[in-house]
Amino acid sequence: MLLVDTSVWVNHLRKGEPRLQQALMDDQILMHPFVLGEIACGTLHRRSSILNDLAQLPHAVSAEHDEVLAFLEQHRLYGKGIGWIDAHLLASAALTPCRLWTLDSRLGDAAASLKLGTNN
C-alpha cells in the first residue's frame, strides 16, 4: 500500500501520473486527511468530483499530535527540512504500515531513512 503525498497528487492532477493511475486501479493507494486538506486548498478543475473521489479512498492511520512529536524525537527527524504535515505523513506511514510516495526530496530522504520510501 502507498500513502501518496500532495506533491504526487498535484503532479497527477496537472499532467497525469501513469504509475499512480495504475496503483489506483489496483487499490494500492491510501489517503491522509491532511493531504486531502492540502489538495482542497488549491484550485481544481472538477473540484467537487475530485475531492469526493479522493475522500472515498481508504485512509491511512492518522497519528495524534503527541504521537508525532514523540516520533520526531525518537527518529531524530528535527532539523531535516521537513514540515509538520510531512512529519504526520511519516508517522502515519509507520503506523499503517505502508510506503510513502512523495516527489519532495527532503520528505523522500526522511522516508528512506525510516525504510518507508517507495525506493526501499
What are these model-predicted stretches?
Residues H12, P18, H59-N120:
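Active-site neighborhoods of divalent-metal-dependent phosphate/nucleic-acid chemistry enzymes
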Residues M1-V35, A40-N52, N119:
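Short, well-structured N-terminal submotif of metal-dependent ribonuclease cores
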Residues Q56:
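Conserved nucleotide-sugar phosphate-binding/catalytic loop shared by glycosyltransferases and other
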